[in-house]
Every structure is written in C-alpha cells, then in structure tokens.
Amino acid sequence: MILRKKLSYLWTLGLCLVASKSPPKAPSITNDRFIEECLRLHNEARTNVSPPAADMKYMSWDEALAKTAEAWAKKCKFIHNSCSSKSFKCHPTFQYAGENLWLGPLTISAAKFAINMWYDERKFYDFNTRSCSQVCGHYTQVVWAYSYKVGCAVAVCPNLGSPDSALLVCNYAPAGNYPNMSPYTNGTPCSMCQGDTCENNLCRNKERDKSQRYPNWNPSGTRQLIACNPLYLISVLLTIF
C-alpha cells in the first residue's frame, strides 16, 4: 500500500515536470495587454470599413465570452463550438454568440495576426451584393455592426501541429452573420447612433460599453485539480521521502 502511494506521488511529480517543459504560456484572458490588443484591432477594423457604416457600434470586452472562448480553446479542437447554435449556452445573458477561430504559431502575436487575417477577407466580400468569392465569414463577424461585445482566448495545442501551435478563439455577442443580411448599414458614420456618442466612426454608449463580471459563469464545467508550482512539488517530495 505504501509503495503504491509513493508510486502515485511520483506519477504526479512526473506530470508536473513534463508540464514545466511545455511551450511558452499563452496570454491569460485577464492579461490587460492581450485584452487591449484584441479590442484595438477589432475596433480599428470596424472604424475603417468601406463603404462607411452608419450604425457601427464600438466593441468592448466581455468576461463571459472570454471564459467561453478559453474553455473551448483549451480543448484544442479546430472546429466551432456547438454552444454557438444553442440558446444561452455560450453566454448567461446573450442568447447566441458568434465565433471566429485561428490556428498558427504562438511565437507571433496570435491576436494581431488572426484579426488582421480575418479583416483581410474584406477583399473577397462585395458589400453591395452581399456575395463572397472565397472566405468572408470571419470578416463579416468582425465588422457586424450589432455585435458589440467580444471575448478572446489563446491556448497552446501541440496536437494541432507543432509544439508551439496556438488556437485563438474569439466569441461575439450578439451573434452576427445572419443569412441575407449586410454586416452593417452603409451611410454617414454614426448617423444611426440614436443617442450614442460618436468616436472614430463608432457609436459609443457608456452603459453598453461597461465591463461586467460573471464570477459564476463556468462554461468548461471543470476545475484544475493539480497546481504544478514549486511549493506543491516540494510537498510531494517531502511526502515521498
């Protein structure tokens, strides 16, 4: 029994040592620099749409969407989350959420590369006819006027390619990309703001842009059982010896 227990501790220690040699960590969903970059790139894309938008809302960060993105990214599956088609499964207050995915190396700025790549799809999209010659869905979601909340997350996924492969997931609410609809209304910037202020061609509203906390939102349904930190490793070694 004692031997079995020691072997169990050694197995745990081995897992932690392996984890300690993993690729560089992906940015956290609470990392201010990561959040700022995601918001800046999304809003720059929305500001610069052509033709100009009369009703383009400023996009602000949403904690619950980021948690959902993080939970899905950590599964390391390069497919869309099924929650996006299920009522209130991606977010506690928004009925549906949109989603964009990107897969690439973690060695570059995942958010910058991904969002710029999504925005570049505009060259395949004809606004007047709502037609697309190649892939445009990422672009239309990024500039969907009434999607005003976003939450993104990055996870390292060696199983999807190389040891530094990273999966970036961005969730949007309210969801965009509805069939037979334009992503926004063409017109003088902010002319359809309806009481909002206008900033960089985007409709802003302090109440709508406010960041909310969702402490009870746990889309993954799981908790981390082992914390592989130095103090934990020391306690394991002391227990064994």
From Swiss-Prot:
Protein name, entry field: GLIPR1-like protein 1
Task: Write down the Gene3D superfamilies for this protein, in alphabetical order.
Answer: CAP
Per its UniProt record, what Pfam families does this chain match?
Answer: CAP (PF00188)
Q: Which gene encodes it?
A: GLIPR1L1
**GO CC term (a single one):** side of membrane
Oligomeric state and interaction partners are given as: Part of a oolemmal binding multimeric complex (IZUMO1 complex) composed at least of IZUMO1 and GLIPR1L1; the complex assemblage is influenced by the maturation status of the male germ cell. Interacts with IZUMO1.
- Domain (SCP) ranges: 39-172
Signal sequence extent = 1-22
Q: Where does this one sit in the cell? A: Cytoplasmic vesicle, Secretory vesicle, Acrosome; Cell membrane; Membrane raft
Q: Does the keyword Nuclease apply?
A: no
Q: Propeptide residues, per UniProt?
A: 221-241
Q: Which UniProt keywords apply?
A: Cell membrane, Cytoplasmic vesicle, Fertilization, Glycoprotein, GPI-anchor, Lipoprotein, Membrane, Signal
What are the BP-aspect GO terms?
fusion of sperm to egg plasma membrane involved in single fertilization; sexual reproduction
Membrane spanning residue stretches? none
Query: GPI-anchor amidated serine: lipidated where?
Result: S220
PTM (free text): N-glycosylated. N-glycosylation decreases during the transit in the caput.
Annotated SMART domains: SCP
What topology in the membrane does the UniProt record assign? Lipid-anchor; GPI-anchor
- What function does the entry list? Required for optimal fertilization at the stage of sperm-oocyte fusion, plays a role in optimizing acrosome function, the translocation of IZUMO1 during the acrosome reaction and the fertilization process. Component of epididymosomes, one type of membranous microvesicules which mediate the transfer of lipids and proteins to spermatozoa plasma membrane during epididymal maturation. Also a component of the CD9-positive microvesicules found in the cauda region.
The main place the protein resides is cytoplasm
Q: Where does the entry say this protein is expressed, by tissue?
A: Highly expressed in testis, where it localizes to round and elongating spermatids and differentiated spermatozoa in the seminiferous tubules and epididymis (at protein level).
Q: Which family does it belong to?
A: Belongs to the CRISP family.
